[in-house]
């Protein structure tokens, strides 16, 4: 099946960050086979021609760190620091989850993400009360591209920890897929919730199965103080000593890093998922993304969960990310528009090991989203497309979402998920949680 999308303004996010004012994209099945400017007059014979009527077409957004199973917990524990927020609000509520609640919560997060332009994401879920196969089936049904990882903790007895490791290894062996729509990573929660032995076992599983690692690291000053007091090392050095960085690793946050740590992370291909809104809301601080990029670290933007954000709008994350860097450095050139877009598209895709997506180029997966600026005053005049995408647009502006060549959202309607049922069930299950 060959489909041509014509009469579009195409934000390619190729090496030149080229914007094609009037162009077309040809998709064959799940792959982009041509991207050109001008009227459609291709040598390709196509099955369908779709007039985009001047819509902006850009790569699907890539969320490098989130927790969709937590989506029912939006608004729980506002105005709290990370540790008391986790210990007194989030974990007690997660302990009440059943497989049905977990699926309903996941569906809500998936619906919000895909309708706001996210096509790929990397996720960590707490396995308590969760049917992991049902979660993967739910993500698959959404049509999204994802790395969904089972989180490991050292809570409970040593026997509990051993069982968690065994189950995590089985999960990795079942779901790891280097190039498919769904994959997984090895995901120890953090250095403050995992024993040294568990972190070492996670490193072993990652090496033996050739998977990536996903972990919360260097998120707060308290974490750095506590880990240094307990192990005599800061979190980065401690994680490295456990062997975690033998495989490409995504660290969520990286708020509290010094220059030598940034250099070390770059040298060892440790990537950072930058969560600006979540870090601000939990009072964790502001990650120095400018310094990370200058050190050579791969960085991707992320939302974290709705419990600490409180939405999954990647446009909002792009905007706050660039504004924060300008503010903390008192430098209006810090994290310019093109860089912010890169960190939410092709750069983010590279962070989570999905190089097959993130830009609109021949050979890439057909993952793209559209915005119709014609009826949106906040996107007018419509000639400064890149600026408007970062500084004016929001996830509510999305018209269409195509993932792997399939129309997942079309004219604002999700084709893969039952929006009415999902919203009803989310409200019903949320009322049943004991706060």
UniProtKB/Swiss-Prot annotation:
Its EC number is 3.5.4.28, 3.5.4.31. Keywords: Hydrolase, Metal-binding, Zinc. It catalyses: S-adenosyl-L-homocysteine + H2O + H(+) = S-inosyl-L-homocysteine + NH4(+); S-methyl-5'-thioadenosine + H2O + H(+) = S-methyl-5'-thioinosine + NH4(+). NCBIfam families: PRK15493.1. Binds 1 zinc ion per subunit. InterPro entries: Amidohydro-rel, Deaminase_MtaD/DadD, Metal-dep_hydrolase_composite, Metal_Hydrolase, MTA/SAH_deaminase. CDD domains: ATZ_TRZ_like. Catalyzes the deamination of 5-methylthioadenosine and S-adenosyl-L-homocysteine into 5-methylthioinosine and S-inosyl-L-homocysteine, respectively. Is also able to deaminate adenosine. This is 5-methylthioadenosine/S-adenosylhomocysteine deaminase. Substrate binds at residues 94, 150, 189, 219, 304. GO terms for molecular function: 5'-methylthioadenosine deaminase activity; metal ion binding; S-adenosylhomocysteine deaminase activity. Zn(2+) binds at residues 65, 67, 216, 304. It comes from Bacillus cereus (strain ZK / E33L). Its cofactor is Zn(2+). Belongs to the metallo-dependent hydrolases superfamily. MTA/SAH deaminase family. Pfam families: Amidohydro_1. It is an enzyme of class 3 (hydrolase). HAMAP family: MTA_SAH_deamin (MF_01281).
């Amino acid at each position: 099946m060959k489909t041509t999308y014509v009469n579009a303004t195409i934000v390619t996010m190729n090496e030149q960050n080229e914007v094609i004012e009037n162009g077309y994209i040809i998709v064959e099945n799940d792959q982009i086979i041509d991207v050109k400017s001008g009227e459609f007059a291709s040598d390709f014979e196509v099955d369908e021609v779709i007039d985009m009527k001047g819509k902006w077409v850009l790569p699907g957004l890539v969320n490098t760190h989130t927790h969709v199973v937590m989506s029912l917990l939006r608004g729980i524990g506002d105005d709290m620091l990370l540790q008391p927020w986790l210990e007194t609000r989030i974990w007690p509520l997660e302990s009440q989850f059943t497989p049905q609640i977990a699926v309903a919560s996941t569906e809500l997060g998936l619906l919000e993400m895909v309708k706001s332009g996210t096509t790929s994401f990397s996720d960590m879920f707490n396995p308590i009360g969760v049917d992991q196969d049902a979660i993967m089936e739910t993500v698959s049904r959404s049509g999204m591209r994802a790395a969904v990882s089972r989180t490991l903790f050292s809570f409970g007895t040593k026997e509990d920890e051993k069982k968690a490791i065994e189950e995590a290894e089985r999960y990795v062996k079942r779901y790891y897929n280097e190039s498919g729509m769904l994959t997984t990573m090895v995901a120890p929660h953090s250095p403050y919730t995992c024993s040294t032995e568990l972190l070492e076992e996670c490193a072993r599983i990652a090496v033996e199965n050739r998977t990536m690692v996903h972990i919360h690291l260097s998120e707060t000053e308290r974490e750095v103080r506590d880990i240094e007091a307990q192990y005599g090392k800061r979190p980065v050095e401690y994680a490295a000593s456990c062997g975690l960085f033998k495989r490409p690793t995504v660290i969520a946050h990286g708020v509290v890093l010094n220059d030598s740590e940034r250099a070390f992370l770059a040298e060892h291909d440790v990537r950072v998922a930058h969560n600006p809104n979540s870090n601000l809301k939990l009072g964790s601080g502001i990650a120095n993304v400018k310094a990370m990029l200058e050190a050579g670290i791969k960085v991707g933007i992320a939302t974290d969960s709705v419990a600490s954000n409180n939405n999954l709008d990647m446009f909002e994350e792009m905007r706050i990310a660039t504004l924060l860097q300008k503010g903390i450095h008192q430098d209006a050139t810090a994290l310019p528009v093109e860089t912010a877009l890169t960190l939410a598209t092709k750069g983010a895709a590279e962070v989570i090991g999905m190089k097959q997506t993130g830009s609109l180029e021949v050979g890439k997966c057909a993952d793209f989203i559209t915005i119709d600026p014609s009826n949106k005053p906040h996107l007018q005049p419509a000639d400064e497309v890149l600026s408007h995408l970062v500084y004016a647009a929001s996830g509510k502006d999305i018209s269409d979402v195509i993932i792997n060549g399939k129309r997942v959202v079309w004219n604002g309607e999700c084709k893969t998920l039952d929006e009415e049922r999902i919203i009803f069930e989310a409200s019903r299950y949320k009322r049943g949680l004991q706060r």
